[in-house]
């Protein structure tokens, strides 16, 4: 279920503009008519070692997009448009690396693009007086790296780069060891401890991204 996350970044594409050649692979994006900043929310890149049964990249990407859509201050490119651009990015181009000149060509007609990298998602059993700590509650440690580029100039400019870290209490009956975690997609997921933890993470990330984009639009 997780193989698509790596293939997204492994496909090749040169997005240097429109070409009339038969072999052109440029993605044409119609310029939106809007006064809001035009933003791409790239799919979350998962480098964690979680043991969840679903695609956490899909889940977190959707949650961040939903939050920003609710805020209503940014114009987000559709998921289909984002996928069309992202899945063709040249192999080896890392948005968290030192060489990022390709970002402007890779995301044409965008004013900003936000990248996310899940670097930690671990459930740690809490120590207790019980002989087997796995029978008790746990602490969920999550870390997400975010990097936002301003693409309005000649070269992409990083306007936000940080790691958001959070810890959340998971009651014993909802820990991974109890095999009772409500999966993403279940109607009860949003009110489960794991669902609430993910929502709080995405809420903070969405707020940070929006704040920095709007701040740079005023400067």
Report residues per predicted region.
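Extracytoplasmic/secreted cell-surface and envelope-processing proteins
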Residues: 123-129
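Bacterial N-terminal signal peptides
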Residues: 8-16
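Extracellular loop and loop/strand-boundary signature of outer-membrane beta-barrel proteins
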Residues: 130-134
């Amino acid at each position: 279920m997780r193989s698509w996350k790596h293939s997204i970044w492994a496909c090749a594409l040169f997005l240097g503009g429109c070409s009339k050649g038969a072999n052109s692979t440029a993605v044409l994006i119609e310029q939106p008519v809007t006064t809001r900043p035009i933003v791409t929310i790239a799919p979350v890149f998962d480098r964690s070692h979680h043991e969840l049964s679903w695609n956490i990249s899909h889940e977190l990407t959707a949650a961040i997009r939903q939050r920003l859509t609710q805020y209503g201050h940014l114009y987000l490119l559709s998921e289909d448009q984002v996928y069309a651009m992202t899945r063709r990015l040249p192999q080896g181009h890392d948005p968290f690396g030192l060489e990022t000149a390709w970002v402007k060509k890779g995301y044409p007609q965008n004013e900003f693009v936000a990248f996310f990298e899940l670097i930690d998602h671990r459930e740690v059993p809490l120590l207790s007086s019980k002989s087997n700590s796995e029978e008790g509650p746990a602490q969920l440690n999550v870390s997400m790296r975010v990097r936002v580029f301003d693409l309005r100039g000649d070269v992409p400019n990083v306007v936000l780069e940080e790691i958001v870290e959070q810890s959340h209490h998971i009651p014993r009956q909802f820990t991974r060891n109890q095999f009772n975690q409500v999966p993403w997609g279940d109607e009860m997921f949003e009110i489960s401890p794991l669902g609430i933890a993910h929502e709080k993470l995405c809420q903070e990330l969405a707020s940070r991204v929006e704040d920095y984009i709007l701040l740079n639009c005023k400067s």
